[in-house]
Amino acid sequence: MGLAGKAAAETGADAVALPEIPKNLRYMKAVNIASARFGLDFTMETDGSDASYPVNFDPVQPREYKRISVQAKLPGAFNAYNIMAAITAVSSVTGKSFEELAALVPQVTPIKGRMTVIDKGQPFELIVDYAHTPSSFETIFPPVRKRCSGRMFCVFGSGGERDLTKRPLQGEIAARFCDTVVLADEDPRGEDPVELLKMIAVGAEKAGLKMNENLFIIHERQKAIREVFKMAQKGDIVLLLGKSHENSIIYKDYTMPYDEISEAVNALAEMGYKD
């Protein structure tokens, strides 16, 4: 989702109706999904070799299924479905087989700020992602929680002067999956930063977190990141959500240059974790 998509999600803009889904699409299913710190392995089960599909097919007749192994440098089980969609789209345009395209997936380089793993030798796992809506939280948290052997921490906020109704939902969803939630500035714009974050905290408290025990409001994002890093230990996973690839934090009277990945790397360096 780009900036336009993020703005639409934040403002609650009306959705645009998608065209009707064709009835002769390929059957595809991801099985044996194994998501690890730096990547993803799964098997793509499909009823054909490419995206082409007979116009006149008999749904009663049994179909033969292929099983294709896929490996990617993209953590997060949900990326299995993104990869299958991409393979199908490219196959439909180029005519290449699913097997040919699956073999190319390991060469795909992750986009900056999309499930970006930062490893400077610190004992905990650190992930930076763009997730900033309730639906994206529901997507990103479950697979990470499933493979987390320790505690999960997350740092996030919400866009100011945007959809207010999503804020408590963000807090509630994060609290269901994370052991500790730290609320920090995203883009408060003209709103009071702390009051904005308190609206998110309402949902987190509803889900069982307690303020200043496992729920914290630290509106200065740089400070919030450093406080979370101090808490995290071996086996824990820290998620920095919402800013991702963006290069600033917007306040009422000024815009502050900001790079989430650089900030995280600097914070780790201050703790002695460097290349």
Briefly describe each language-model feature range.
Residues 10-19, 23-29:
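Active-site regions of enzymes building and remodeling cell-envelope glycoconjugates
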Residues 26-29, 38, 221:
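Short beta-strand or tight-loop elements
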Residues 3, 7-12, 53-55, 65, ...:
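ATP-dependent carboxylate-amine ligase
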Residues 16-18, 31-33, 41, 78-79:
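C-terminal accessory "lid"/substrate-recognition subdomains
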Residues 32-66:
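Acidic-glycine-rich active-site phosphate/pyrophosphate-binding loop
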